[in-house]
From Swiss-Prot:
Phylogenetic placement of the source organism: Bacteria, Pseudomonadati, Pseudomonadota, Alphaproteobacteria, Hyphomicrobiales
Organism per entry: Nitrobacter hamburgensis (strain DSM 10229 / NCIMB 13809 / X14)
Subunit organization: Homodimer.
Top-level division of the source organism's lineage: Bacteria
Protein name listed in UniProt: tRNA (guanine-N(1)-)-methyltransferase
Pfam families given in the database record: tRNA_m1G_MT
Length: 238
């Protein structure tokens, strides 16, 4: 079973949204497991102190290396599990990483707070820093939920159809094509005729063209990478 362990100072935040919809139903069905642990339980003093002032001065507080290391050691049960630290300075999370994580045993995720985490525990416990975007939140809990939700929906049996995630944004390097449903007319805007034609080949070609156009317009970085791997087909005969 895919299992994720979350280390946090606010365990009451979980499962939160992960207890609803696809992830929630899958959790109840036993398709994945969530282990949430309070970092404060690893504090040594009676005040359950987990942070201290930054060496060299500066604002805020820093999560202590000794406390977090103890929490990681107490929670870890497999050396093969990825150890992640949700951090705005981490490498951007991508769909390919999500696919890889969902295919493994499930990660241990550290949710940071304060000004950050003592660098020594990041190095000593091999924490891979992961970011969900170029912005700063109050803590790592919401990013951790986003990562877990993205992984869980790819687990076997979670989505209704195996192909449900096949054409989603990023699955093939492109953003997803526009979607439509009834009514056929909405405020003078019709569903494109091609989608009602019943010609599956033409529908597929339309969707591919729309996905390419959207990606090129909205995510030139993705488009450049995709176009480099998918050069235009030559019309000349060999």
């Amino acid at each position: 079973m895919w299992r994720t362990t979350v280390l946090t100072l606010f365990p009451e935040m979980f499962p939160g949204p992960l207890g609803l919809s696809l992830a929630g139903r899958a959790l109840v069905a036993g398709l994945w497991a969530l282990d949430v642990r309070d970092i404060r339980c690893s504090a040594a003093d009676r005040h359950r102190s987990v942070d201290d002032t930054p060496a060299g001065g500066g604002p805020g507080m820093v999560l202590r290396a000794d406390v977090l290391a103890k929490a990681i050691d107490a929670a870890e049960f497999s050396p093969d599990r990825p150890r992640l630290l949700m951090s705005p300075r981490g490498r951007p999370l991508t769909q390919s990483q999500i696919v890889e994580l969902s295919a493994g045993p499930g990660p241990l995720i550290v949710c940071a707070r304060f000004e950050g985490v003592d660098q020594r525990v990041i190095e000593a416990r091999g924490l891979a820093e992961v970011s969900i975007g170029d912005y700063v939140l109050s803590g790592g809990e919401i990013p951790a939920m986003a990562l877990i939700d993205a992984c869980v929906r790819l687990l076997p049996g979670v989505m209704g159809k195996a192909e449900s995630g096949a054409d989603e944004s990023f699955s093939h390097g492109l953003l997803e094509y526009p979607q439509y449903t009834r009514p056929q007319q909405f405020e003078g805007r019709p569903i494109p005729d091609i989608l009602l034609s019943g010609d599956h080949a033409k529908v597929a070609a339309w969707r591919r063209a729309e996905a390419e156009a959207l990606t090129k317009a909205r995510r030139p970085d993705l488009w450049t990478a995709w176009a480099g791997q998918n050069p235009p087909k030559s019309n000349t005969d060999g």
